[in-house]
C-alpha cells in the first residue's frame, strides 16, 4: 500500500462536501467531528474543513497538514469506501499550541477507526 496522498483521495468538489453534510453520519470527541458517508469506491477520500475562528492561516494550514499526514500514514487502519470530512472543534482551537502531533493523531485515529457502514 502506497503512503502517498493522491488527488483521487481528496474531496474537492462542493457537491461532495454538501452531500456528506446532508446525508452523512457523524462521530465526535473533544477535538474533532468526523462526518462520513459511503462512496461506492474501493478507497476512502478525505476533506478537511477548518473555520477562520480556529486562528490565523498558519495555524489552520498546520492543522490541515497534520490531518492529511495522519490520513496518509494510516490508510491501512482507516476503513475503505468512505468519504470523510474532518472538522476541528473549539477545544482543539483553544489548546492547539499546547497539544502535540501525537496527541492529535491518537484522538483522530480513534474516531477514524470507528467508522462503519
UniProtKB/Swiss-Prot annotation:
* UniProt cross-references to InterPro entries, sorted A to Z: Ribosomal_Su5_D2-typ_SF (IPR020568), Ribsml_uS5_D2-typ_fold_subgr (IPR014721), RNase_P (IPR000100), RNase_P_CS (IPR020539)
- Coiled-coil stretches are none
Which one GO biological process term can you cite for this protein? tRNA 5'-leader removal
Q: Which UniProt keywords apply?
A: Endonuclease, Hydrolase, Nuclease, RNA-binding, tRNA processing
User: What is the E.C. number?
Assistant: 3.1.26.5
**Subunit note:** Consists of a catalytic RNA component (M1 or rnpB) and a protein subunit.
Cross-referenced HAMAP family, in alphabetical order?
A: RNase_P
Q: What is this protein called?
A: Ribonuclease P protein component
The organism of origin for this protein: Thermotoga sp. (strain RQ2)
